[in-house]
Design a protein with these regions (language model features):
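Extended amphipathic alpha-helical segments enriched in small hydrophobics
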Residues: 255-279
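Conserved beta-strand/loop scaffold segments within soluble protein domains that form the structured core
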Residues: 30-256, 260-263, 284, 290-301
């Protein structure tokens, strides 16, 4: 039996008519897929997380000891419903690099709940690659508790057909001189719909902190729906927060350029739709992950 649950809540509500305060989905009892605990400092861990039943739930706990770096790749293979909860614990002067790659079935529903806590000078680098199959709901909550803690996120997505891509990312600055940088980029085709909520919250006591967020969206169809919600909250005076969004279409000059080289409009759209994910893949600096991403792109486009 399914219940209706509310996920991806904005920390501060806005007008209900905008439809971005939270998202309601149908979800029920899920099979327990167990828990992974990772503390392998200085190494790269690779997890293949597969949900083959009606619904499955997986827990991943990542701990970076003081002064150490932990790198984890999660490949997420949802057949129907899959919830992956990943918790990051970053001690002083440590770093976690988490790369999440969606490789799901067409009619699947993938939920990502990713959270993190950073001590003094602790760092989190989050990379999410959402490859255009199935519905995706991603919720990230990160706490920069220690002075000098930092968070960066690179998110690349493709939405097509009747797909839903629904994202919520919240970074809370508690410590002094903390930093955050959020970059999201993607393309929407056919009748896809997407929400991106990005919140940077400067708490009282976070003096000297800096945060920025930027999203770039390419809209490739009259039926697509895009909602971009950048939000900066501030309870501290001596901080710097920036946000921006670039939303555009494939213009006639660009189409003419492609067509003059024998590339059809449909092929040109696919090339441009791939661009954000290909660019993000190059930053991963891991040949196996890059090859998997590019191979999946070839299948979906």
């Amino acid at each position: 039996m399914n219940d209706t649950i509310l996920i991806n809540r904005l920390p501060t509500r806005t007008w209900n008519r905008l439809g971005v305060n939270e998202t309601a989905i149908a979800w029920g009892q899920a099979d327990d897929l167990g828990e992974e605990k990772i503390t392998a400092a200085g190494q790269t861990e690779r997890l293949e997380i597969t949900g083959s039943g009606e619904r499955g739930e997986k827990m991943v706990d990542i701990h970076a000891p003081a002064g150490q770096t932990v790198t984890v790749f999660e490949t997420l293979r949802a057949e129907k419903g899959l919830l992956v909860r990943t918790a990051l614990h970053v001690e002083k002067d440590a770093k976690v690099r988490l790369v999440q790659i969606q490789n799901a079935a067409q009619d699947s529903l993938l939920r990502l709940e990713t959270s993190g806590e950073c001590a003094e000078n602790g760092q989190v680098e989050l990379i999410q690659v959402l490859l255009g199959r199935g519905d995706v709901y991603s919720d990230g909550q990160f706490e920069l508790n220690g002075n000098g803690a930092g968070f960066t996120a690179g998110i690349g997505y493709l939405g097509q057909k009747q797909q839903t891509v629904d994202m919520n990312l919240v970074v809370n600055h508690w410590g002094q001189k903390t930093t955050s940088e959020i970059n999201a980029a993607g393309a929407l085709k056919d009748d896809a719909q997407k929400i991106f909520r990005g919140t940077i919250d400067f708490k009282k006591g976070s003096a000297g902190s800096v945060g920025s967020e930027q999203e770039t969206v390419l809209m490739l169809g009259d039926g697509v729906v895009n909602k971009t919600v950048p939000l900066i909250l501030c309870a501290e005076e001596n901080v710097v927060g920036n946000h921006g969004a670039t939303i555009g279409e494939l213009d006639e000059d660009t189409l003419f350029y492609f067509e003059s080289r024998g590339i059809s409009a449909a092929e040109a759209e696919n090339i441009m739709a791939r661009a954000a994910i290909e660019q993000l893949a190059r930053t991963i600096e891991d040949e196996a992950a890059q090859a998997a991403i590019l191979s999946e792109l070839e299948e979906v486009l």
